[in-house]
Amino acid sequence: MTSGIMIASNVLLWGAFLALAALMLGVIRQIGLLHERSAPLGAMMIDHGPDIGERSPVFSMTTIDGVPVTVGRAVSPGRPSLLMFTGPSCPICQKLLPIIRSVAATEGADVILISDGTQAEHREFLRNHPLDGEHYVVSAEIGMRYQVSKVPYGVLLDKDGVIQAKGLCNTREHVESLFETTRVGHSTLQNFLKHGVEDASKHVH
């Protein structure tokens, strides 16, 4: 009789343990989903151009002010480069310019603004938004090579011209995420969050 009671108790304990484990797994998954929905999403990759980890194609260009610049390699030795695809009539690009400048200064990166359109449009844009150390290049070719379909779109290159991160950038968080992904070791912050949830689920098992 005592043996039967002990067996029943063990069965109940194991049942309670498994139920608790299943509940914890469900909670972890819900937290992950909530985190993805509530946290500012990182820059979204929407192009099909050169991949992260590949060396950037190189373009010998001249800035709108007539200064030669090589797009795809370090502007300053030892410093990363942020290629930001913009448009002179893009309101988000105009709002984002001081943010790009601030984040790049914090991260020690050179900024190359790459745009398309008429010279008149660019001159008007620059009258309203003067440059402050950024390189401004007018080129449809670079955007086509990277297959950028929407702006503002950022591509972060390391000091050797290797693509570290890229994605659509509509907010400060998006711009910052280009640099943050290199620190967390994932191509995008979405990928980092996804792997974090999966790793937590494995620990429960």
UniProtKB/Swiss-Prot annotation:
* Involved pathway(s): One-carbon metabolism; methylamine degradation
Asked if Transmembrane is a keyword of the record, the answer is yes
> What is the protein's known function?
May be specifically involved in the processing, transport, and/or maturation of the MADH beta-subunit.
Q: Report any Pfam family annotated for this entry.
A: AhpC-TSA
The protein's matches in NCBIfam families, at most eight in alphabetical order, are given as: MauD (TIGR02661)
Q: How does it sit in the membrane?
A: Single-pass membrane protein
Q: Which residues cross the membrane?
A: 5-25
Q: Which CDD domains match?
A: mauD (cd02967)
Q: Which GO terms describe its molecular function?
A: antioxidant activity; oxidoreductase activity
Task: Describe the location of the Thioredoxin domain by residue ranges.
Answer: 50-184
The protein's matches in InterPro entries, at most eight in alphabetical order, are given as:
AhpC/TSA (IPR000866), MeN_DH_accessory (IPR013478), Thioredoxin-like_sf (IPR036249), Thioredoxin_domain (IPR013766)
Where in the cell does this protein reside? Membrane
Listed GO biological process terms: methylamine metabolic process
Q: Which GO terms describe its cellular component?
A: membrane
Q: What is this protein called?
A: Methylamine utilization protein MauD
Q: Does the keyword Transmembrane helix apply?
A: yes
Q: Which UniProt keywords apply?
A: Membrane, Transmembrane, Transmembrane helix
